[in-house]
């Protein structure tokens, strides 16, 4: 049995917040981050144990290089929509570049395709189940990093197609990989964010 209680585990999960304005340093070593991510990959569940999740790590200068590529692709897209949009979001994205590291979460498309072909009765569900697996991996890695003492925030730069293609090229992943999320991390430079207000439990929990 684990050495922590359910309440302790939930307290750890509740500590996780979206932390912005991160420093370009990390009190957690690259080796420790790799160890934490490897641990999550070794046990996090997926439907039928299909294991569609893949993760790439970028530390230090590689993180900066990655974000330089992202900014290069994002700027013309946002300016074409509205120059004011880039003026507003550009500094926010630069803050992500200023962090220390990146954790990229991918879905291996071939895994999802093979699972759908093997389990035809539920073939239409594997994309959704893959998203469930992604969420589990992301929250576990994110919480583990914050327990180690660094802050993190989850981004979805794949919302802009040219950006995802550029990130895939930079990471050298196979063509069937789909970027699902991008976790930035680094030392916190301000007070840890408070938990936001939630709806009353009476509105979100039903006893049948």
Tell me what each language-model feature is.
Residues 114-118, 165-166, 194-195:
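A short secondary-structure junction signal
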Residues 194-208:
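Phosphate/diphosphate-binding glycine-rich loops and adjacent basic-rich segments that engage nucleotide
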Residues 69-73, 115-120:
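Short, flexible, mixed-charge acidic loops at enzyme active sites
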Residues 104-116:
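A structural motif
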Residues 40-41, 109, 119-167:
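Small-aliphatic-rich amphipathic alpha-helix that forms the alpha element of a beta-alpha
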Residues 1-101, 204-208:
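N-terminal amphipathic, basic helical "cap/leader" segment at the start of enzyme domains
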Residues 101-106, 183:
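Active-site-flanking beta-strand signature of metal-NTP-handling nucleotidyl enzymes
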Residues 75-82, 169-195:
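A glycine-rich helix N-cap at a beta->alpha junction
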């Amino acid at each position: 049995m684990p050495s922590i209680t359910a309440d302790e585990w939930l307290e750890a999960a509740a500590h996780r917040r979206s932390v912005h304005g991160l420093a370009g340093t990390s009190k957690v070593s690259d080796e420790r981050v790799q160890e934490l991510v490897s641990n999550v990959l070794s046990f996090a569940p997926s439907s039928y144990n299909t294991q569609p999740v893949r993760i790439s790590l970028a530390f230090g200068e590689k993180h900066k290089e990655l974000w330089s590529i992202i900014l290069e692709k994002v700027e013309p897209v946002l300016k074409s929509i509205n120059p004011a949009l880039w003026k507003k979001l550009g500094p926010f994205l630069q803050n992500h570049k200023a962090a220390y590291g990146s954790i990229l979460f991918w879905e291996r498309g071939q895994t999802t395709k093979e699972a759908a072909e093997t389990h035809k009765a539920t073939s239409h569900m594997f994309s959704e189940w893959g998203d469930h697996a992604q969420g589990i991996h992301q929250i576990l890695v994110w919480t583990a990093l914050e327990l180690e003492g660094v802050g993190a925030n989850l981004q979805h730069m794949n919302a802009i197609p040219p950006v995802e293609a550029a990130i895939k090229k930079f990471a050298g992943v196979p063509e069937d990989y789909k970027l699902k999320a991008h976790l930035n991390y680094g030392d916190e430079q301000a007070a840890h964010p408070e938990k936001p207000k939630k709806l009353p439990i009476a509105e979100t929990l039903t006893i049948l």
